[in-house]
Amino acid sequence: MNNPRSVSPLVSPANHSDLLENQRQSGSGDFSRLEKRIGARKMKFHSKSMPRGAMFLDQEASRNFHDKRYDLFRTMSGKLERQISNLRGKPTESSLQDHKEITESLTADRYFDALQGPELETLKEKEKIVLPEDKTWPFLLRFPITSYGMCLGVSSQAIMWKTLATTEAEKFLHVTQVINHVLWWISLLLLLAVSITYLFKTILFFEAVRREFRHPIRVNFFFAPLISILFLALGIPHSIISHLPSTLWYFLMAPILFLEMKIYGQWMSGGQRRLSKVANPTNHLSIVGNFAGALLGASMGLKEGPIFFFAIGLAYYLVLFVTLYQRLPTNETLPKELHPVFFLFVAAPAVASMAWTKISASFDLGSRLAYFISLFLYFSLVCRINLFRGFKFSLAWWAYTFPMTAVASATIKYSDEVTGVATKILSVVMSGAATLTVIAVLGLTVMHAFVQRDLFPNDVVIAISAEQPKQKRWFKHLTKESYGNNERCPKILDPEDNQIDLESPPLVNVDSSTVQNSN
């Protein structure tokens, strides 16, 4: 005899109605009691769908974060997973293949094949990435090294306002040093925030940082944190410290020197990372570090060290300037969306002008030559209004701020040497334009970061595959049949009786009249 008490309260919705029907047909007296029990209780069925509320979204985000494809970029999880698999004796082929795709060193040619644009950060159509394309990646994977451009823009403003407050020619403006003080602390906090975030990325996702360093364009931004520290040292208010120790200069310039030896050596090596192939306006960041270091060293009273770095910067700036202006076939034309990087042309000569002024203790001929070059490049870019229209906001817009501020600071130095109404007006206009640009770009950055939340999209640069997309079998077969066998390839004679192998494209079209005459 069936006991209704033996029925489990956890009954699936597919069979609880059948249970009631069987009890009804059997005429059991306990049917009403069973029906009341089932109807009165708010029973929880195993197949019941859970509500899609905030808790569900948190669980979904957690599952996305724990995607195994993200683990391949983690610093320790990939090694630990492989060790566990080896201990179990079951290393899966897919995991080994995914690990190979991540850890295999990417060549410069692979970046050029998979990406496009002046900064090589746009994925080509037929390329695939090793991370999910339809999901938002963890924030650290989306935080690029190019974020240090914000630090360059704000810290350079601290230098400019310090120069305005301490220059005799600009005393009529009555600029207080409080502005320099506030901007310096903002720059320091911003640099700490960006550095701590990128440090966590280095610790947790070292493979992503390694891929950025091997990127032929992104590698130039590894100079940005060092240059930002140099700018903080140059813009530090006198109320905080009046004289910096010279040992700080050696401590800051040592990593810049080692990084330059690697980058400049690759430019001259003639390999995949030769300058004629990777030349880009962002390469000016590696040049600016020399002039900024020379400016700081000369401000500290040093002599030989600043001249050494100034000479290196001058030599490589001339080489880079000529290479970029040549527009070699290996360099693609810059599209409209990333035109802000053009303003990096202005940064190096502007900082070089101020550096040589400190080295020579006067705004002499060398300083004026560098300043006039930067001023001409500045106005030649500003006059091209089309550069400022038709592209969306991104971190690349910060390329406007630092060069414009550098030219404004050099103009203030020039107005102090060549006094006059025109130079004073020019310095005020340049300083105002630089300040308004920084305010506008900073406001847009805050809006896109916290309101629209699209400032940091998925960074496809770090997720490209180490292998090129495989071609279709029929295409390979056609290519092999057409050009694979040299002996079966027909040969014809050109008018000079030279044999032309049809294997090598382009194919030669034979004139019909020539064929008739030969017949």
UniProtKB/Swiss-Prot annotation:
Query: How the protein sits in the membrane?
Result: Multi-pass membrane protein
The UniProt GO MF terms for this protein read: voltage-gated monoatomic anion channel activity
Query: Can you state the subunit structure given in the record?
Result: Homotrimer.
> In its keyword annotation, does this UniProt entry include Membrane?
yes
Q: Cite the PANTHER family for this sequence.
A: S-TYPE ANION CHANNEL SLAH2 (PTHR31269:SF33), S-TYPE ANION CHANNEL SLAH3 (PTHR31269)
An example of a Gene Ontology cellular component annotation for this protein is:
plasma membrane
Main location, first listed in the record = membrane
Record family assignment: Belongs to the SLAC1 S-type anion channel family.
Q: Which residues lie on this side of the membrane: Extracellular?
A: 162-185, 242-247, 303-304, 362, 411-424
Q: Which UniProt keywords apply?
A: Cell membrane, Ion transport, Membrane, Phosphoprotein, Transmembrane, Transmembrane helix, Transport
Question: What protein name applies here?
Answer: S-type anion channel SLAH2
